[in-house]
Amino acid sequence: MARTYLMENYQNYPFLYAKAYATLIQRLSAGDRVIVHCTAGKDRAGTAVAMVLTALGVPRDTVFEDYLLTNQYWDRGGRERPGMDPETVAQIFSAREEYLNAAFSAIEDRCGTVETYLKDVVGLDQTALAALRTACLD
């Protein structure tokens, strides 16, 4: 049940938060420093960072490697939940490749490519992408 819930959320994140991604990328393009966080730091924040890395041209396998680092660096204290089975707790508190893959699959199913998604849904044209890359990579 938790897995299904998370998979559905990840499929929706790129479309629910497209405006937030646009704002984040605009701020980064302007040279602003930002902090991206949420309760667990892997779902909404992880997807946002994955979209930024993708917009920067980072290879997909590297985007996934970065996302999965959450499992190494996130404080595992306090994960015990009375009344919840350990697998459910693990599903909720783990960054899993299948979750982020659900987001990218939803983008590709609806838009064809991530590039089309960034242009048509997030609103980033080639000029905006170039500004982001200049601000973050130069």
Where are these regions (language model features)?
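Cys-dependent protein tyrosine phosphatase-like superfamily
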Residues: 1-35, 47-138
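Ser/Thr-glycine-rich phosphate-binding loops at phosphate-binding pockets of nucleotides
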Residues: 40, 44-45
